[in-house]
Amino acid sequence: QHDEIYFEELLEEPYWGGSKTNLIDTMFYGNYYLNVYDVASNQLIYSRGYCTLFWEWQTTDEAKTTQRCCSETVVMPFPKNDVRIEISARNKKGKFVKKFEYTVDVDSYFIKKDRRMQYPTYDVHYTGNPSRRVDIVLLPEGYTADEMDKFKADCKLFAEGLFSLSPYKENQGLFNIRAVLAPSQESGVDIPGEYIWKNTILNSSFYTFDSERYIMTYDNKSLRDLSANVPYDFIYIIANTQKYGGGA
């Protein structure tokens, strides 16, 4: 199977939710790996392993007969000086092979700074400095403006469920959970197998990869733009539906 990575744009977001000191990923998890090097010294200053929806799609039957593209984003602390970004993919032998390289001029006027999806936010569980916490952002999918109170209540249920389990229960003080109050035009989510289509803010859908219970969004850019309302490490989508399902 073959994959290629193409550059689209650079965007400076208002917040960084990750650590400001622990910047090098030494675990080497995931099927892709981001390395960021200082251009002047060639020193590695940031790295992170991750997985993509595209990689998961490559394992499907559809990938055997057609080609497809997926939006992908990588995030990093905004650098002080010019950097070189390298993205590698894990091959069949488990080794990372470089697929993409791009040099970022930090003074370039092509680095966009627009806030694309600004909405109010809601603190579900806040304990302190984002750089020293695990920051979770909860995004609403298929909640209309009249259903924002329902979304807040569902966010509280999420937090209660998370902190009812170990080791989260013992470490509640190390977590922040925030929600973005972003309404959809219609209530509910897409269920293609039942011919149900909804106009929602993140374009999530059941039947991802033709798996009935798999709900996911291909709209990666909206996902990131909506999350950018708060500092975050992890993104969860709360879907307004009675149908059982999920995805990761």
Give, region by region, the residue ranges found by the protein language model:
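Short, surface-exposed amphipathic charged segments that create phosphate/polyanion-binding patches used
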Residues: 192-199
